[in-house]
From Swiss-Prot:
GO biological process: lipid transport; lipoprotein metabolic process; negative regulation of cholesterol transport; negative regulation of lipid catabolic process; negative regulation of very-low-density lipoprotein particle clearance; triglyceride metabolic process; very-low-density lipoprotein particle clearance
Keywords: Lipid transport, Secreted, Signal, Transport, VLDL
Gene this protein is translated from: APOC1
Subcellular location: Secreted
Domain of life: Eukaryota
GO annotation, cellular component aspect: high-density lipoprotein particle; very-low-density lipoprotein particle
Function, as annotated: Inhibitor of lipoprotein binding to the low density lipoprotein (LDL) receptor, LDL receptor-related protein, and very low density lipoprotein (VLDL) receptor. Associates with high density lipoproteins (HDL) and the triacylglycerol-rich lipoproteins in the plasma and makes up about 10% of the protein of the VLDL and 2% of that of HDL. Appears to interfere directly with fatty acid uptake and is also the major plasma inhibitor of cholesteryl ester transfer protein (CETP). Binds free fatty acids and reduces their intracellular esterification.
Any further remark recorded for this protein: Apolipoprotein C-I is present in acidic (APOC1A) and basic (APOC1B) forms in P.paniscus, P.abelii and P.troglodytes and perhaps also in baboons and macaques. The two genes for ApoC-I arose through a duplication process that occurred after the divergence of New World monkeys from the human lineage. In human, the acidic form has become a pseudogene sometime between the divergence of bonobos and chimpanzees from the human lineage and the appearance of the Denisovans. Pseudogenization resulted when the codon for the penultimate amino acid in the signal sequence was changed to a stop codon.
Keyword Amino-acid biosynthesis: no
UniProt protein name: Apolipoprotein C-I
One Pfam family from the record: ApoC-I
Amino acid sequence: MRLFLSLPVLVVVLLMILEGPGPAQGAPESVEASSGLDKLKEFGNNLEDKVREFFKRIKESDIPAKTRNWFSETLQKVKEKLRIES
């Protein structure tokens, strides 16, 4: 229930932040918007780099191979037990 209520609130807050300052605040909108977009673009680029590095580490690690081997060994053990019992 909390998630159901918090998602609309989060969307409204995000829209208010992205909307920028109102005209009464007197900040030049073009400079403010471009700096906000630059920050957002920089954040996106940083996030992309981190995600790529994360997946690269997973591909290079031996965790997938170990997991695959464990499943294969477990499946073989189950097959052997079924052959013995039948």
